[in-house]
A protein has these predicted regions:
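Short acidic (Asp/Glu) and glycine-rich catalytic loops that position anionic groups and cofactors
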Residues: 38-39, 58-65, 104-113, 163-168, ...
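Conserved catalytic cores of soluble enzyme domains
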Residues: 1-93, 196, 204
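Non-catalytic terminal/interface segments that mediate subunit docking, oligomerization
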Residues: 121-204
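Generic secondary-structure boundary/loop-capping signal
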Residues: 31-33, 38-39, 43, 52, ...
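Short low-complexity stretches enriched in small and charged residues
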Residues: 21, 26-27, 115-124, 155-157
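Short capping/connector residues at structural and topological boundaries
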Residues: 39-40, 46-47, 60, 117-121, ...
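Terminal amphipathic helices with adjacent charged low-complexity linkers/tails
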Residues: 73-130
């Protein structure tokens, strides 16, 4: 079954391990920290005075890939979990539900004709392409703060759940880094488990 976890306060030890092992994780920017050890232990062991936020706040863990997303508060964390689960089947024996699509089938986007510059050295907005091609407002990005040269997330195409993987030429020209490779591998494993097809956009 799909497992989604929210950190809503200070999380340490085994609960922290369960959180990072989830298929999707989110933490509250206002109240959450994920810690191996708290400030008192760090002060005794290392002689350094650090706050819980400095040791394990959202800025730390969305950047290092420990959690997928950060949300403003508890309510937004739970909203992110609901959205993630809306793309998922109940278990691996089932396919994700297909929802009614109210995106007009005749919709076109003239901006796509010239959104990719003729000058290959010039960056462009891959997010704009993704959002235009897929069902409107359906793209749910995962791990935006980590491995930023790669874009991963879930979306819908004609109501069907799809995985999205693209390289982002606004960061390191879309090149594959160690963090980007780890992020992409983890996302492909998620899609392999729950079977949504993957749509890939590649910038060379």
């Amino acid at each position: 079954v799909p497992v989604a976890t929210a950190a809503l306060g200070a999380v340490a030890g085994l609960p922290a391990g369960r959180l990072v092992a989830s298929h999707f994780s989110v933490m509250s920017k206002a109240t959450a920290q994920i810690l191996t050890a708290g400030p008192a232990v760090v002060a005794r062991a290392m002689g350094e005075q650090k706050t819980k936020e400095e040791l394990g706040g959202w800025k730390v863990h969305t950047k290092n890939g420990t959690v997928d997303n950060g949300a403003a508060d508890e309510a937004e964390c739970l909203a992110e979990i609901r959205r993630f689960l809306s793309f998922m089947p109940d278990n691996i024996e089932l396919l994700a539900p297909v929802i009614d699509c109210d995106d007009p089938v005749e919709r076109t986007d003239e901006a796509l004709l010239d959104i990719v510059p003729r000058d290959r050295r010039q960056a462009f907005d891959m997010h704009r392409i993704i959002q235009s091609v897929l069902d409107l407002t359906s793209f749910f990005e995962m791990g935006a703060g980590y491995g930023r040269s790669q874009i991963t997330g879930l979306a819908r195409l004609n109501g069907q759940t799809v995985g999205v993987w693209a390289n982002n030429c606004k960061f390191l020209d879309g090149s594959m880094t160690a963090d980007g490779a780890h992020k992409a591998r983890r996302f492909m494993e998620l899609c392999d488990t729950f079977s949504p097809p993957i749509i890939s956009w590649v910038v060379e």
